[in-house]
């Protein structure tokens, strides 16, 4: 018996293994008449690429079309996985706001302006990288604050926070806040404002933008230039890149408000030149809305220089031929900007208390008006409304790659406590000053081993005070 011939059991039917007898000359292996391989299991065979092959199909048909099963089989698994991942990432970075077409239109204008090299301009004030976004006419339409350029972000272009971290690391950051979540805090404040119908926060949402004026790492800029060069010199290679330009940055996109000035400027003017009674009433009502917003989100960075006042006292000419004029009633509006340091996971209890600086204003000593009670109390007294607010914030905050459910529960527990105190203060007819003097409360969801259709909560007071307390 030849050593190279296959071993066959003596009891097995003798099968003809003379492959050449059933095949055309030059073909080492062929199929048996019944369409099966005429070979012993375990023997390596080579299947001919003939036109009658039931597996390969027609050899003359050429390469398989893209997307066909054969084409997908030939594509490496790693490459397919990377392609799907790149497509998913591109979908996440697409700015879509179906529920707010007006906001979507502003974002589209900003994107078109960037394509035409009308780039965002960095704002010199502040301790983080923030930018004035313009339209194609060069007009400022929004303020964009990238996540990684926040006060404690890795690419913050302002050196003040870097110097603070280097020289005084023990006082660096705010331990009551979730770091690098300022863009979500900005968008969350706008969400709370809309839910409560306060209408004092310019609409703010999470947006992806890319611009040469943003602060990128050297590696990102080199990669971008290399990809552009490859696309110009070797188009076949450059077309395989998922992205050619700089990577988009995620951040808060807040609509720009015109005609406003720092509150400190107008408050000094009003102190020297008191407002008429009706106008002063408008200011008080707007101020109370600011108090409600700041208190619920527990804003840790509210001074008199980061909220705005617009004071209009228009005069229309009644006739061009005489000096008669019609004086309209002045209009006052407040815009609450810079909400990036809110939604703490605990009440401040370390070095600083981070007070509300509006608490020292004369307006803070006046009891809450009936108008603000009628607007706010029916909402925050309704458990279903509060639950919906929590769910909306959850859908917003979970978009962050570093989202932590445990930290979010702590943030919501603080917010529930603030809502509880505010509800009681409005019912008792207190003033904003008396409200901020109320002991801070945390309302957590109670853990139960038994299933229940309704949630229960536990209430606790914070006994520890900051080292530098303001009361």
Curated annotation (Swiss-Prot):
PROSITE patterns found in the cross-reference section: PI3_4_KINASE_3 (PS50290)
Keyword set, alphabetical order: ATP-binding, Cell membrane, Cell projection, Cytoplasmic vesicle, Endosome, Golgi apparatus, Kinase, Lipid metabolism, Lipoprotein, Membrane, Mitochondrion, Nucleotide-binding, Palmitate, Phosphoprotein, Synapse, Synaptosome, Transferase
Domain PI3K/PI4K catalytic: 117-445
Keyword Ribonucleoprotein annotated: no
Region annotated Activation loop, chain positions: 336-356
Segments of this protein annotated with the region Disordered: 1-25, 48-101
Region (Catalytic loop): 298-306
Protein name: Phosphatidylinositol 4-kinase type 2-alpha
Enzyme category, top tier: transferase
GO biological process, alphabetically ordered: phosphatidylinositol biosynthetic process; phosphatidylinositol phosphate biosynthetic process
Organism annotation: Xenopus tropicalis
């Amino acid at each position: 018996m030849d050593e190279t011939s296959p071993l066959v059991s003596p009891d097995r039917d003798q099968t003809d293994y003379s492959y050449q007898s059933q095949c055309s000359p030059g073909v080492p292996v062929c199929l048996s008449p019944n369409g099966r391989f005429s070979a012993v299991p375990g023997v390596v065979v080579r299947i001919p690429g003939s036109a009658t092959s039931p597996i390969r199909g027609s050899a003359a048909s050429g390469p398989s079309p893209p997307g066909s099963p054969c084409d997908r089989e030939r594509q490496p698994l790693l490459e397919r996985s990377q392609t799907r991942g790149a497509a998913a990432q591109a979908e996440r970075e697409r700015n879509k706001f179906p529920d707010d077409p007006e906001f979507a239109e502003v974002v589209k204008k900003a994107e078109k302006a960037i394509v035409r090299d009308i780039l965002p301009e960095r704002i010199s004030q502040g301790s983080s990288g923030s930018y004035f976004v313009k339209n194609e006419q060069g007009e400022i339409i929004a303020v964009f604050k990238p996540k990684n350029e926040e006060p404690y972000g890795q690419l913050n272009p302002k050196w003040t926070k870097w110097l603070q971290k280097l020289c005084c690391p023990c006082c660096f950051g705010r331990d009551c806040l979730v770091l690098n979540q300022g863009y979500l805090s900005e968008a969350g404040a706008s969400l709370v404002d809309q839910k409560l119908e306060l209408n004092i926060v310019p609409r703010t949402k999470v947006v992806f933008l890319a611009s040469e004026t943003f602060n990128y790492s050297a590696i990102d800029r080199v990669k971008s230039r290399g990809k552009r060069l490859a696309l110009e010199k070797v188009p076949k290679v450059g077309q395989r890149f998922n992205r050619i330009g700089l990577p988009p940055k995620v951040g808060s996109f807040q609509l720009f408000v015109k005609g406003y000035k720092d509150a400190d400027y107008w408050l000094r003017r009003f102190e020297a030149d008191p407002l008429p009674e009706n106008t002063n009433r408008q200011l008080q009502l707007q101020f109370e809305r600011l108090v409600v917003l700041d208190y619920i989100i527990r804003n840790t960075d509210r001074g008199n220089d980061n909220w705005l006042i617009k004071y209009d006292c228009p005069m229309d000419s009644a006739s061009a031929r005489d000096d008669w004029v019609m004086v309209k009633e002045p209009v006052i509006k407040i815009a609450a900007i810079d909400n990036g340091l809110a939604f703490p996971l605990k009440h401040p209890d370390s070095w600083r208390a981070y007070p509300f600086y509006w608490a020292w204003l004369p307006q803070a000593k006046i009891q809450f008006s009936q108008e603000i009670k009628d607007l706010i109390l029916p909402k925050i007294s309704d458990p279903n409304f509060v639950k919906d607010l929590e769910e909306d914030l959850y859908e917003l905050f979970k978009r962050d790659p570093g989202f932590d459910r445990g930290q979010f529960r702590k943030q919501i527990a603080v917010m529930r406590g603030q809502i509880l105190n505010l509800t009681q203060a409005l019912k008792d007819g207190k003033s904003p000053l008396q409200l901020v003097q109320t002991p801070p409360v945390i309302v957590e969801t109670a853990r139960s081993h038994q299933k229940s259709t309704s949630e229960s909560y536990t209430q606790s007071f914070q006994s520890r005070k900051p080292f530098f307390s303001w009361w």
